[in-house]
Regions:
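Active-site C-terminal subdomain of aminotransferase-like
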Residues: 183, 216, 224-338
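N-terminal entrance/gating region of PLP-dependent enzymes' catalytic architecture
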Residues: 1-96, 362-364
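PLP-dependent aminotransferase-class I/II
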Residues: 103-107, 123-124, 128-131, 137-194
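Conserved beta-loop-alpha segment that forms the PLP phosphate-binding cup at the N-terminus of a helix
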Residues: 76-79, 83, 97-122, 139
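Catalytic PLP-binding core of fold-type I/II PLP enzymes
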Residues: 189-227
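Conserved C-terminal alpha-helix-loop-beta "cap" of PLP-dependent enzymes
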Residues: 27, 137, 272-284, 304-395
Length: 395
């Protein structure tokens, strides 16, 4: 029956049975993996998704989404609509002053945001916290930008005292500052307003700094939380220059993708006309996945602000509840305020494998995304507590 189902799906272009069997095995493996996934910030609640008929088309958003191109099979209009949705979420009150695009991932957005900063300030040094995503120093290496990792607080935020000390040491040299809204391992939020206040106090005005926000996960969480402090809200009126987020994380697309929004003045600085495309070169990739654009568009407008707000509020509450449950075993557990990430000592290898936990430096975490079920949290809590009691008795 499964082979017949696959044959009906592929129709006249049916694949050999050997290949169909391999696809079915892959489908089964993925289904099982999704059911026990707890370690990475992927929202697996995709919803209805896109019509299968759209898979028949090569949809390529070439060049600048605001300029279009010679290629007619694009969805640039829907890309602009999706970006405008995000712009409003992040406080872009005059949309004409901002630019955005959808790319391969939040990492692509961070690389491009840092590139915009380098073009604005060619002699700048890139500053980031020790808890920043690995793609931030990678962006520096790719672009041959000098970078400096600053110490973090124990809960994973950028230490503002370390930032102030570094600015004194730099003696006025321009800086590109990468801040994080939801750090990779601990789900911490850098104090955006506090960091900008430190910059201002050191006489680093907008002409001597560029600030990028890596909001891969929580730039789609914090704006929806009514009790989140204004200082960690990724709103452009705080004074930063660009922000990126992932589509396959809180937004919930079935493929990796992401979005970048930046002040238009920075993009205008690097824009080049490309006659071959009848467009402008303003993006890192020349070809951008139109199917990813459609997936983000469907999620943003189909799910809507209200449901995203509910998802964020409920997920934060459930993460805090999970942390309390794990602490009942006597384990040390960190769950930052307004975070979906629950951090604990790395458990037994079988628990790591079963729940696909992300581990680093002796720590591991679970991330309570909207797609995580209560049953999965119950199973994980039981396994974690049994293992912790065993380790405690053995010690």
């Amino acid at each position: 029956m499964e082979v017949q189902r696959m044959q009906e799906f592929f129709g006249r272009r049916s694949l050999p049975e050997r290949m169909l069997q391999q696809l079915m095995q892959t489908e089964t493996r993925l289904r099982v993996a999704h059911e026990s996934h707890l370690g990475y910030p992927y929202n697996l609640s995709f919803g209805p998704g896109l019509p299968v008929t759209l898979q028949r088309f090569l949809i390529n958003n070439l060049g600048d989404p605001y300029a279009g191109s010679h290629y007619a099979s694009d969805v640039c209009e829907m890309e602009r609509e999706a970006i405008a949705w995000l712009m409003r979420l992040w406080g872009c009150y005059n949309l004409e002053d901002y630019w955005g695009s959808i790319g391969a991932s939040g990492t692509e957005g961070s690389i491009w945001g840092i590139y915009l900063g380098r073009e604005a300030l060619p002699d700048a040094i890139l500053l980031h916290s020790a808890d920043a995503h690995y793609s931030i120093p990678k962006a520096a290496r790719l672009q041959r930008i000098e970078a400096c990792s600053l110490r973090s607080t124990p809960n994973g935020e950028l230490d503002l005292t370390a930032l102030a000390e570094k600015l004194v040491e730099l003696k006025g040299r321009p800086v590109i500052l990468a801040l994080t809204c939801g750090t990779t391992m601990k789900g911490a939020h850098d104090d955006i307003a506090g960091a900008i206040a430190v910059l201002e106090a050191a006489d680093y005005g907008p002409d001597r700094r560029y600030i990028h926000i890596d909001g891969a996960l929580n730039a789609m969480v914090i704006p929806f939380l009514q009790d989140a402090p204004d200082g960690i809200r990724p709103m452009f009126d705080l004074g930063f220059d660009s922000i990126s987020t992932s589509g396959h994380k809180m937004i919930g697309t079935p493929m990796p993708c992401g979005a970048l929004v930046a002040r238009k003045s920075h993009v205008a600085r690097i824009s080049r006309a490309i006659s071959y495309l009848k467009s402008n070169d303003t993006t890192l990739m020349g070809s951008r996945n139109g199917h990813a654009v459609l997936a983000i568009w469907v999620r943003l407008f189909g799910h809507g602000y209200g449901l995203f707000a509910n998802d964020a509020t409920v997920a934060v509450d459930r993460a805090a509840t999970l942390a309390k449950r794990l602490r009942t075993s006597g384990a040390e557990v960190l769950c930052n305020p307004h975070s979906l990430t629950v951090v604990f000592d790395e458990p037994e290898p079988e628990v790591v494998r079963k729940y696909q936990l992300a581990c680093s430096g002796g720590l591991a975490h679970a991330i309570v995304m909207p797609s995580v079920t209560d049953d999965l949290l119950d199973q994980f809590s039981d396994d974690f507590q049994k293992g912790h009691r065993w380790r405690t008795q053995k010690a």
